[in-house]
């Protein structure tokens, strides 16, 4: 049984020859430990793809979660100059006059000098037409140029997973602050649900395109759906139906497992998360970070869902 087969067995509720091993490292960790060149790592598709593969080989992982699927290949051509920054970082000057500081172990910090467009604070300020419809045929050709070479090089031996951010995560991102998005759910439930519907249709496009390329599983990133943000009732209203639609579509059209990543306080809603049809759950945080005890969760979930570490 190879790694790909091992993961497939575990994700489908069967017994593999041993417990599979894989982990999603932070991009900062990958940059610090597997990026020979920070510019290549952050601004070329090859750099990040190589780091994903190197990490999996170093730690003998059974799978790779590709959390960033593509990178604009013209970015290096837009660089004017690269200088040395503090603590091993880099300072990038761009031809458009902006600049970025790249720490050795964290995301680039971009400084354009142009004030950011203010996002709405209230749902009445939200223009639904600003949620542009995503069409697969209109996606840039490079949208999956990190995922594709990983599938080509490691897809026969390792379990390769794709990822989408859920509609609810993106909905909160439409507003100036997270709390503004949460208040919007109360202030105008109908408008919020229409925004979620439109966003979920766009998420489906990215999910389908990754599935079509041959991923073995799809992760739904839903970090704000725990009790620290939403009650059970609001979860049922604003999260469950949209994640259920996404998972049912992937199951029906591609037959691959899906799993949900929600951090923190989810001990009160594991039963609701199962109602999405998910095949697995990721990130069962114990107290004090979360509200889930692994033993209790295992008994509740039973054979209905696999448990995956983060």
State where each predicted segment sits:
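Aromatic-acidic/polar surface patches that form glycan- and anion
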Residues: 45
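A contiguous, low-structure linker/loop signature
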Residues: 73-131, 157
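Catalytic domains of carbohydrate-active enzymes, especially glycoside hydrolases
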Residues: 48-67, 209-216
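Short, charge-rich binding segments
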Residues: 55-58, 80-85, 150-154
């Amino acid at each position: 049984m190879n790694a790909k087969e091992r993961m497939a067995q575990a994700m489908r509720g069967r017994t593999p020859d041993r417990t599979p091993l894989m982990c999603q490292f932070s991009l900062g960790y990958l940059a610090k430990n597997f990026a020979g060149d920070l510019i290549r790592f952050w601004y070329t598709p090859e750099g990040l793809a190589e780091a994903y593969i190197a990490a999996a080989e170093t730690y003998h992982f059974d799978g790779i979660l590709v959390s960033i699927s593509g990178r604009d290949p013209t970015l290096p051509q837009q660089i004017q100059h690269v200088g040395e920054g503090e603590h091993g970082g880099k300072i990038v000057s761009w031809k458009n006059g902006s600049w970025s500081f790249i720490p050795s172990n964290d995301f680039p910090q971009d400084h354009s000098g142009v004030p950011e467009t203010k996002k709405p604070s209230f749902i009445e300020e939200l223009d639904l037409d600003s949620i542009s419809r995503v069409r697969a045929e209109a996606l840039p050709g490079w949208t999956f140029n990190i995922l594709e070479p990983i599938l080509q090089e490691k897809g026969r031996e390792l379990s390769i997973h794709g990822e989408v951010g859920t509609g609810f995560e993106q909905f909160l991102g439409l507003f100036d602050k997270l709390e503004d998005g949460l208040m919007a759910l109360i202030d105008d439930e109908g408008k919020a649900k229409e925004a979620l519907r439109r966003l979920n249709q766009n998420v489906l496009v990215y999910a389908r395109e990754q599935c079509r390329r041959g991923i073995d599983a799809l992760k739904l990133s839903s970090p704000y759906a725990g009790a620290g943000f939403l009650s059970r009732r609001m979860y049922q209203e604003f999260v469950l139906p949209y994640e259920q639609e996404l998972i049912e579509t992937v199951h029906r059209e591609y037959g691959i497992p899906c799993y949900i990543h929600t951090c923190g306080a989810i001990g009160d809603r594991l039963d609701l998360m199962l109602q999405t049809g998910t095949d697995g759950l990721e990130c069962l945080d114990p107290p004090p970070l979360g509200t889930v005890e692994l033993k209790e969760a295992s008994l509740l979930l039973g054979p209905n869902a696999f448990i995956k570490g983060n």
